Amino acid sequence: PMTTWRLGLDGFDPEQLVGPKQRELISSAEFTIEPIMRRRFRVAMEATWSLLNDSFEQNPLFVPLTEAEFKYQADQMLVVFDPRVSCLAKVGGEPVGVVVCLPDVNPLLRATRSRLQLSTPWHYMRFLRSRARASLIFGGVRRDHQDRGVAGITLRHAITGMQRAGYR
């Protein structure tokens, strides 16, 4: 089953996602959190694929993705990807958690009528400047790091990035 929530970012304090476990993890010299950047997108997506399959393995409704299936979907994301709203968490340099968010592309699809046309580049540039909503596509934490505060930290990082970027 899938559930969808809406979160208005105006007035939301991402610090409420930080508790004792998160503070302890943040203070660790081994822990880092970094945005998923375009220049290292493919490397980050390899880690993301691994984290997705590992973190959802115990879910009886989850069907693991092959690397080719995940790569196909990830390559489609690159066109609209915003590095300010997605991140990888690492412990000792090893990826342990991820949050992947994408801007809402519906305004772009509506403006272009879902067709590639002469005006599409103009609509795309307009879309890049006026993104207001984002969707959390998925978040996951490697099984051996679950219940240690990683999820709260990655969510805080993504939501803070959305707020700074002007998402509502």
Predicted regions and their residues:
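Conserved active-site alpha-helix within GNAT-family acetyltransferase domains
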Residues: 1, 152, 163-166
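Conserved GNAT acetyl-CoA-binding A-motif
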Residues: 133-134, 162-168
